Amino acid sequence: VDCIKKKTDVVNKITKDLNLNNVEVTWANVKNINKNYDFIVSRAVAKYNKIKSLCSNKFLNKNLNDKKNGFILLKGDNAKAEFYKCKEHHEFSIHDRIKLDYYKTKKIFYVPNPYIHMDN
């Protein structure tokens, strides 16, 4: 979901070129979306609390993957403080896998659905 059509057009092209059939790209404002998702993926557009508030009630209740439904967020190295109140979160260094200077300060933060406790 993105409100900028140019971005959604690019992502649609990438998903088509890679033959990714389990990806849905929507050109809209997240506030106007009435669907639910396994994962919400974001790239450093806002602080975690803002993203969390925009995405309340946007997760599917049933987990269909190895990881629990939740947020997957690309953030800079200084974003760790955004997650100090999270009951559970995991941080991954991108540079550990992609040895480009650009990724030295980039992290992926995974936060399981913070709205409900899910055991399945």
How does the language model describe each region?
Residues K62-A81:
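Conserved beta-strand signature within the Rossmann-like core of class I S-adenosyl-L-methionine
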Residues N22-E24, G70, E91-S93:
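Conserved beta-strand segments of alpha/beta enzyme cores
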Residues L20, D66, K87-H89:
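Short, well-ordered coil/turn elements that cap or connect secondary structure elements
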